[in-house]
Amino acid sequence: MRVGVVGHRGYVGLPAVLNTLLDSAPALNFTLAFEEELWDMAEEGERLTQDTPIDAMITLGGDGTLLRGARLVNGRKIPILGVNFGRLGFLTSCSADEMEDGVQRLARGDFVSEPRMVLESCAIDGDRSERCRWRALNDVVMHKGGFARLVKFSVLVDGEHIGSYSADGLIISTPTGSTGYSLSAGGPIVMPTFESIVLTPVSPHTLAMRPLVLPADVEVTVRADDGPEELLVTVDGQVGTTFTGGETLIVRRAPEPVHIVRLPGATFFTRLRHKLGWGGLSGRDGEAT
């Protein structure tokens, strides 16, 4: 089995973890390929790019590392085992202490591959030419950047104008992304298996404009009508571009999902309770059942 490895270099114990993976690879029948940032730390194995043929991926870090790994998968049907070395790790498959068991289950095929809906987005310039395209597992966000002023957005769903948002920004999220930035901005929690697109305004200047849950098969179009001359579009909090008046952002469901490894007992609501304190109050998590 060819396995791609993506990791967060900021984790001080990462070299030891890479050595552990390399030492166990022969017994697991793994051939390891490391992303460019890790290859010099591993000192052996292959280099991992978007074009490297792999059968599975292991990410070593937090949710951001898993999101970066999902971009490298680039639409291929490759299960991603996320090992959490970060603070929250809501998307990851197991903790650092559970890594050995998780990797062995990956080798045996003893896991559930959970498909997660992905968004496909593109920026169209004033000449109607596509200049950028991205895939987002979490969200696509149009926001004002560093300017302390509102932006007025026009939003269309399947070509129908549904309203204008005066806000600091607009989050367009997947069900997976509903527990990320969208949740912080007051958006709803959506189960990952309920395919949909969530629109959540960031600090809207009205009480009438609330988050909106749309069917997964619609196309969302966003234009900036008024605000700073230059806005930002950010994808999964990691990549993006500038955005100016006269340009259009189009977001729709991508045809290929991302496949995240789920181990026995790791249900969505278990993670909600343990990671986000769902159903309990701060300091009283132990009372939740």
UniProtKB/Swiss-Prot annotation:
- List GO molecular-function terms, semicolon-separated: ATP binding; metal ion binding; NAD binding; NAD+ kinase activity
Question: What chemistry does it catalyse, as a reaction equation?
Answer: NAD(+) + ATP = ADP + NADP(+) + H(+)
Residues of the active site: 63 (proton acceptor)
Report the top EC class in one word: transferase
| Entry EC no(s) | 2.7.1.23
**Which keywords are on file for this protein?**
ATP-binding, Cytoplasm, Kinase, NAD, NADP, Nucleotide-binding, Transferase
Primary localisation category: cytoplasm
Biological process (GO) annotations held by this record are: NAD metabolic process; NADP biosynthetic process
Localization per record: Cytoplasm
InterPro entries named in the record: ATP-NAD_kinase_N (IPR017438), ATP-NAD_kinase_PpnK-typ_C (IPR017437), NAD/diacylglycerol_kinase_sf (IPR016064), NADK (IPR002504)
* Family matches, as SUPFAM superfamilies: NAD kinase/diacylglycerol kinase-like (SSF111331)
Q: Which residues bind NAD(+)?
A: 63-64, 68, 138-139, 149, 168, 179-184, 238
Is Transferase included in the keywords of this UniProt record?
Answer: yes
- GO CC field: cytoplasm
Question: Which cofactors does it use?
Answer: a divalent metal cation
Determine if Protein transport is one of this entry's keywords. Answer: no
Ranges that cross the membrane: none
- What protein family does this chain belong to? Belongs to the NAD kinase family.
Function text: Involved in the regulation of the intracellular balance of NAD and NADP, and is a key enzyme in the biosynthesis of NADP. Catalyzes specifically the phosphorylation on 2'-hydroxyl of the adenosine moiety of NAD to yield NADP.
Instruction: Tell me the protein's name.
Output: NAD kinase
> Which species is listed as the source?
Gemmatimonas aurantiaca (strain DSM 14586 / JCM 11422 / NBRC 100505 / T-27)
